Amino acid sequence: MANSSNLKKPNFVGVDLGGTNIKVGVLDDAGKTLSYVTTPTLVERGPEDATKRMAEAVLQGIEKAGLTPADVARVGLGSPGTLDIPTGSLVRPSNLPGWNFFPIRDKLAEYSGLPVTFAHDGPAAAFAEYWVGAGQGEEGLILLTLGTGVGCGIVLNGHVWNGTHSHGGEAGHNLIDTSENARWCKCGQRGHLEAYASATGVANRTIEYVEAEFKTSLTERVRARKRDDEIPKMVFEEAEAGDEVALRIVKETARYLSHGMISLIHTIDPSCILIGGAMTFGGKTTATGRIFLETIEQETRSRIFLHLAERLRIDYAVMGNDAGYVGAAGLARQDWEEAQIAE
């Protein structure tokens, strides 16, 4: 492997492994992206093939940045699914079928010739916000990402919190509904936050409003849909146009999310919670996005201890689709720095 101990201005590579694509970014020590490369995951070919192509993308990104492997101190790899971080293995990644118990960290190190830091994609995204994003300087940061599911990453005192069994931050499976008719989560349990505050939850509730014949401009669009995952965008567009049912769904989603946040706040006492992911209804740039955040704030602050409500910052994340690879590179940088101190 490359010897990084003598690098004056080290560079780092971040890899974001997804079910569809692998994103690779080469970053300098300040967190600036020098080059960016993507390659399809091609899950069906298996983890060995994907890891070899991942390593090729890492080396391609290094060359594209005008560097050599000797200029890179370390690679960071962020992965979805159930992981065993100490051993660097995928355990049961739900969106990577057939990849169970694959030692991906060591394989990437072998194929790239560079040392590798391994992390869950949620904490990696949170670390990106802490390092160069909206969470800079925060002592306790929680990032909640809203998409098909609800992801989470926690950064405490500058370090990601992975938990004892590499499961820390699975806030999407916090219980928010104990009723007999609680919604099913895709994990097979009822009443989890993810079943209510994710894009899937929004789609399911919207369908119910349409089937109950509420008066809404969503009706024709929802009935004509090709896929359920088109519905959250419809809700956003109709909410922007002032549709009352669409706005109701947005506010419901905000309240459900806040209910999941409350237990996190009282347990962890963060200084900041950031909301990111694909389903933020346009963020601060749109009226609906502002209503969404305002509703989250109002519901949350009204239900937590007053001294926390007065101090907690709730805001949108800013790193977007770059968060995964940037955070992975940042974690690689942190590991490298700590190794230098130890020497």
Task: List PLM regions with ranges.
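ATP-binding/phosphotransfer module of carbohydrate and carboxylate kinases, centering on a glycine-rich
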Residues: 1-74, 84-89, 106-114, 128-138, ...
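Short hydrophobic alpha-helix segments
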Residues: 37-39, 94, 164
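General beta-strand structural signal in soluble alpha/beta enzymes
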Residues: 116-120
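Short beta-strand scaffold segments in enzyme catalytic cores
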Residues: 22-26, 150-155
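A short acidic/small-residue loop/turn micro-motif
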Residues: 40-42, 98-99, 167-170, 176
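A charged helix-plus-loop insertion that forms the helical arch/lid used to bind
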Residues: 88-99
